[in-house]
């Protein structure tokens, strides 16, 4: 698999990432996203997005400009968190990459793989990447308070 490169990334930085993907299937349940996050210097979402869109021919079928895809993924990564000062330890670009990788796993195993078309893969990968994009809240307690207040307003 030809590994894409982020603009400005040095060749010696790409080599460990290349070795990682040569020995780890991106759709395997055992995939170590946190190792990828370290190797890519917090760009696991970008690498997985580029690789999945190329591997499943989404780029070719939908005639997606890879520079625009790259820019989209870089923007998604850099703006994923709503409030960077909050440093939400869960709803961040790493979580988006984790859900993307897990989604790829489920799309390629079991009965779902026989029913999926490329358009479905396109939609589900974009949804997986951005499902918590700029999410303001971090925990269940916040949501419970929010929804309790909301429902009490109708009583």
Residue ranges: model-predicted function:
Residues 44-47, 94, 98, 119-120, ...:
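Generic recognition of stable, solvent-exposed alpha-helical segments in well-folded globular domains
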Residues 51-55, 102-106, 132, 136:
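Generic, well-ordered alpha-helical scaffold segments in large soluble proteins
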Residues 120-155:
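Divalent metal-dependent catalytic cores for phosphoryl transfer on phosphate-bearing substrates
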Residues 88-103:
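Active-site-adjacent "gating/activation" loops or surface patches in catalytic cores
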Residues 7, 115-117, 134-135:
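Arginine residue identity/basic-tract feature
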Residues 1-91, 107, 142-151:
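Non-catalytic interface/linker regions that flank or bridge core catalytic/transmembrane domains
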Residues 77-79, 102, 127, 138:
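Structured beta-strand/turn binding interfaces of compact recognition modules in eukaryotic regulators
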Residues 109-122:
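Short pre-active-site segment immediately N-terminal to the catalytic Zn-binding motif
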């Amino acid at each position: 698999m030809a590994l894409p490169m982020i603009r400005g990334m040095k060749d010696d930085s790409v080599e460990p990432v290349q070795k990682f993907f040569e020995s780890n299937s991106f759709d395997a349940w055992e995939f170590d996203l946190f190792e990828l996050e370290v190797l890519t210097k917090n760009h696991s979402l970008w690498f997985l997005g580029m690789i999945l869109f190329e591997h499943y021919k989404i780029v070719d079928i939908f005639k997606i400009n890879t520079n625009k895809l790259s820019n989209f993924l870089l923007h998604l990564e850099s703006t994923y968190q709503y409030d960077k000062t909050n440093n939400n330890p869960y709803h961040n670009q790493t979580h988006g990459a984790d859900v993307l990788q897990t989604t790829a796993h489920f799309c390629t195993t079991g009965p779902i793989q026989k029913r999926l078309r490329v358009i479905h893969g396109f939609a589900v990968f974009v949804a997986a990447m951005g499902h918590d994009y700029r999410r303001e809240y971090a925990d269940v307690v916040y949501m419970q308070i929010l929804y309790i207040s909301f429902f009490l307003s109708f009583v």
